[in-house]
Amino acid sequence: MNKLIIPAAIVATGIIAASAWSQQATQQAAPKFQNKRYFTMPLEKDPTREVGLQSVLMPPAGGNEFHRHPGDQWTAVQEGEVTFTIYGKPPVVLKPGDSNYVPRGVIHRQQNLSDKPARYIEMRIFDKDKPASEAAPN
């Protein structure tokens, strides 16, 4: 009987340690963005939509999951590299001076796969009173 207690204790300790490590790894998600919003205001000729301009700082290993917006989005990279992926297409690396356009509803994501921060300016024209983004359907 004593011969079984020690191996059982070792196995139990291993299971507990693995569970704790798994929870810690799950909690350490990729860093998110730091946004600085310059303005958001209604469009003069269409008050159901609004235009906004913001600066985004993305830390190394930062990024987001696939998502979509209720409007159009333009991005211009100022510093670092931003890996931009439209769902189902190959990723594109944007560098300072590069820009891109995402039409309404297109599923996409941005990531900083480098070891340096990335900064970009983003202009959006979205439907007013709707969430700025929604997770892509599975």
Describe the residue ranges of each PLM region:
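Ligand-binding loop in jelly-roll beta-barrel domains
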Residues: 91, 105-129
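Short histidine-centered beta-strand/loop micro-motifs
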Residues: 64-69, 86, 111-113
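Glycine- and acidic-residue-biased ligand/ion/polar-headgroup-sensing regions
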Residues: 69-88
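Short acidic-glycine-tyrosine-enriched beta hairpin
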Residues: 58-59, 88-105
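A short beta-loop-beta micro-motif enriched in histidine and acidic residues
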Residues: 48-50, 61-74
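Short beta-strand segments in beta-sandwich/barrel cores
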Residues: 63-65, 81-85, 99
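A short, N-terminal "cap"/entry segment at the start of jelly-roll beta-barrel domains
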Residues: 2-6, 14-55, 100-101, 131-138
